[in-house]
From Swiss-Prot:
Subcellular location: Cytoplasmic vesicle; Cell projection, Axon; Cell projection, Dendrite
Natural source organism: Rattus norvegicus
Feature: compositional bias, Low complexity: 178-207
Function: Plays a positive role in the antiviral innate immune signaling pathway. Mechanistically, interacts with MAVS and functions as a positive regulator to promote 'Lys-63'-linked polyubiquitination of MAVS and thus strengthens the interaction between MAVS and TRAF2. Also plays a role in axon and dendrite arborization during cranial nerve development. May also be important for neural crest migration and early development of other anterior structures including eye, brain and cranial cartilage.
InterPro entries per the UniProt record, alphabetical: N4BP3
Residue numbers bearing the Phosphoserine modification: S172
Region (Disordered): 173-234, 327-359, 422-456
UniProt keyword annotations, A-Z: Cell projection, Coiled coil, Cytoplasmic vesicle, Developmental protein, Neurogenesis, Phosphoprotein
Protein name: Nedd4 binding protein 3
Main location, first listed in the record: cytoplasm
Assembly behavior: Binds NEDD4. Interacts with 14-3-3 proteins. Interacts with MAVS.
PANTHER family xref list: NEDD4-BINDING PROTEIN 3
GO-annotated biological processes: innate immune response; nervous system development
Residues in coiled coil: 295-523
Length: 537
């Protein structure tokens, strides 16, 4: 064991002289925490942190004065008194206490970095709630465990309280105790979580950060102070606050966002900062864990897909077997022969019998021809309907022209009668011309002028009547030509329909013959049945 001289010139003793073993022996710690390590929750999972009862049993361990009297001689110096003489503010953890220079100078992390990402509900129990139940608030000290150890209501006695404060303070100086926010976040992640949620990823990594902080703190101390702390560094580590358990999928999904937040918070610090290196290492570990979880999930999904594919193939095979069975039953009910097996030796084909495939091909070809003829028949019927509509319109026009011609003939007859009456009146007026006076001559001249006008009107009417007759004759001739044309078209369409009907009958007979041949080909040949020859198509 290493020894060092104190300020009073007294040599350092063993570790047992500095610690009160009746309070903090490793066997008693293991016995007090034995129930919390191997305990399980009602659902079969491991409990992730210490309960309230285990924690108080950890703080209030029973004293064993007999073992202390046997192990430590009475002539040993009182190192507690010497420690408080040398460090008058070692156990002062009040609100106004400030850390001494050189003893607490180490790289700190901001309190907002390691806050728990998920807040818990009713079961939240932190170190501050345990220590401040009397209304006293904890200030930013070197850890909530230190404050709990030095709190008057929780300490069993003044001497034990001083020894516990001395031990915890020395351990915090040697191991680099975390910040209050760091300790609170770790304790909140350990004690305040419900059984359903996993441990916080930051509380599981605080041991590495504290270890680095303690190394930096030891480097900044003086050789005089590093002696007793080197002795205390050989002590066994306290039990872990919770047992390790695999992180859940939700926590693993939150890890990249947490890493980004830590990078932003620590961006103003130096790259060579050990905390930054530790956090980067934790980030790499988290990413590898995330990839592993993703690979496992993909493997599981692939296995499920493979199993479902095998099940579907099995169901498809069963459906095919059922379909074959149903076909056989249907064929047996219809009285047809079963399908020839392809696995057996091929039967010799009859050279005189027509192949079934050729007969089927001919049937398909004739069916196509029938459909083409049907299409042509529909087109001819549509054209015939159009021609009939045109004939009806021409007949209507002819009827109108005939009525107009009759009206013109009646007008012409009336004009002829008027001209004849005028011609009969003219000689009567010319006979007594000798005895007429000048007045009569003048009247005769007027009548002659009126007769000339009537003759001109009659000639004009004759010319118009002649034109109308010629026009009527021309229309009648044109109508007769159209009638003859439509009669020829009608005869042609009727002849075409008769031909199509005859072709339909021929096609029907051919189809009947082909069906008979197919029926003969499908039936097994017998010795007594005559062979049917196919008719020529």
């Amino acid at each position: 064991m290493a020894t060092a001289s104190g300020p009073a010139g007294i040599a350092m003793g063993s570790v047992g002289s500095l610690l009160e073993r009746q309070d903090f022996s490793p066997e008693e710690l293991r016995a007090a925490l034995a129930g919390s390590r191997g305990s399980r929750q009602p659902d079969g999972l491991l409990r992730k942190g210490l309960g309230q009862r285990e924690f108080f049993s950890y703080l209030h361990l029973p004293k064993k004065d007999g073992k202390t009297a046997k192990r430590a001689p009475r002539n040993e110096p009182d190192y507690t008194t010497l420690y408080y003489r040398e460090h008058p503010r070692a156990g002062d953890f009040s609100k106004t206490s400030l850390p001494e220079r050189g003893r607490f100078d180490k790289c700190r992390i901001r309190p907002s970095v390691f806050k728990p990402p998920v807040s818990t509900g009713k079961g939240f129990l932190s170190m501050q709630s345990l220590a401040a139940h009397k209304g006293q608030k904890l200030w930013r000290s070197n850890g909530s465990l230190h404050t709990l150890a030095c709190h008057p209501p929780l300490s069993p006695g003044p001497r034990a309280s001083q020894a516990r404060a001395q031990l915890l303070h020395a351990l915090s100086l040697d191991e680099g105790g975390p910040e209050p926010s760091l300790s609170d976040s770790s304790s909140g992640g350990s004690f305040g979580r419900s059984p359903g949620t996993g441990p916080s990823p930051f509380s599981s990594s605080l041991g590495h950060i504290n270890h680095l902080g303690g190394s930096l703190d030891r480097a900044s101390r003086s050789p005089k102070e590093s002696g007793p702390l080197a002795v205390l560094s050989c002590l066994p580590e306290p039990p872990p606050p919770y047992e390790f358990s695999c992180p859940t999928t939700e926590e693993v999904a939150v890890l990249p966002d947490t890493c980004e937040e830590l990078k932003r918070d620590l961006g103003d610090q130096d790259v060579s900062n050990p905390f930054t290196q530790v956090l980067e290492e934790r980030q790499r570990l988290w990413l590898s864990e995330l990839k592993r979880l993703y690979v496992d999930r993909l493997h599981e999904v692939a296995q499920k897909a493979e199993r479902s594919e095998r099940n579907l193939q099995l169901q498809l095979f069963m459906a095919q077997q059922e379909q074959r069975r149903l076909r056989k039953e249907l064929r047996a009910q219809q009285g047809l022969a079963p399908e020839p097996r392809t696995s057996g030796p091929p039967m010799e084909a009859d050279p005189n019998a027509r192949p079934e495939e050729e007969a089927r091909w001919e049937v398909c070809q004739k069916t196509a021809e029938i459909s083409l003829l049907k299409q042509q028949l529909r087109e001819a019927q549509a054209e015939l309907a159009q021609k009939l509509a045109e004939i009806f319109s021409l007949k209507t026009q002819l009827r109108g022209s005939r009525a107009q011609a009759q009206a013109q003939d009646a007008e012409l007859a009336r004009l002829r009668e008027a001209v004849r009456s005028l011609q009969e009146q003219a000689p009567r007026e010319e006979a007594p011309g000798s005895c007429e006076t000048d007045d009569c001559k003048s009247r005769g001249l007027l009548g002659e002028a009126g007769g000339n006008e009537a003759r001109e009107g009659a000639e004009q009417l004759r010319a118009e009547l002649l034109q109308e007759r010629l026009r009527g004759q021309e229309q009648a001739l044109r109508f007769e030509q159209e009638r003859q044309t439509w009669q020829e078209e009608k005869e042609r369409v009727l002849r075409y329909q008769r031909e199509i009907q005859g072709s339909y009958m021929d096609m029907y007979r051919r189809n009947q013959a082909l069906e008979q041949e197919l029926r003969v080909l499908r039936e097994p040949p017998t010795s007594w049945s005559p062979r049917l020859e196919s008719s020529k198509i």
